[in-house]
Amino acid sequence: MARVTVEDCVDKVPNRFELVMLAAHRAREIASGSALTIDRDNDKNPVVALREIAEETQSAESLRERMIESHQTQIEVDEPEEDQMALLMGSEVDRPVQDDMSEEKLLRALMEAQGQN
């Protein structure tokens, strides 16, 4: 195939606009270092992408899926911390009560509770 045109690929991807989108996506993949599935033959990336589609070394369906995935973004929603949530809702922060019981006092209280004094 000396010259690749859109006509050579229309039987693989009937919609010309979709074909252009898929070929452009594949050309960007090639530019970013993706491995070629055919010989370059001194052609530029868009021509190589069209040749890959025409020779069906890249399926239109897999290109379509990769193109869709590349356009999808996931936005993380920051959830407020529990302490901040309580304050936002107008209630007090649920924290343990501060006590001044030392370890020794705690052990004595436990021993007394068990009756081993």
From Swiss-Prot:
Keywords: DNA-directed RNA polymerase, Nucleotidyltransferase, Transcription, Transferase. SUPFAM superfamilies: RPB6/omega subunit-like (SSF63562). Gene3D superfamilies: 3.90.940.10. GO terms for biological process: DNA-templated transcription. It is an enzyme of class 2 (transferase). Its EC number is 2.7.7.6. Disulfide bonds: none annotated. GO terms for cellular component: DNA-directed RNA polymerase complex. The keyword tRNA-binding does not apply. The keyword Transferase applies. It catalyses: RNA(n) + a ribonucleoside 5'-triphosphate = RNA(n+1) + diphosphate. InterPro entries: DNA-dir_RNA_pol_omega, Pol_omega/Rpo6/RPB6, RPB6/omega-like_sf. SMART domains: RNA_pol_Rpb6. It comes from the Bacteria. GO terms for molecular function: DNA binding; DNA-directed RNA polymerase activity. Promotes RNA polymerase assembly. Latches the N- and C-terminal regions of the beta' subunit thereby facilitating its interaction with the beta and alpha subunits. PANTHER family: DNA-DIRECTED RNA POLYMERASE SUBUNIT OMEGA. NCBIfam families: rpoZ. The RNAP catalytic core consists of 2 alpha, 1 beta, 1 beta' and 1 omega subunit. When a sigma factor is associated with the core the holoenzyme is formed, which can initiate transcription. Belongs to the RNA polymerase subunit omega family. This is DNA-directed RNA polymerase subunit omega. It comes from Cereibacter sphaeroides (strain ATCC 17025 / ATH 2.4.3) (Rhodobacter sphaeroides).
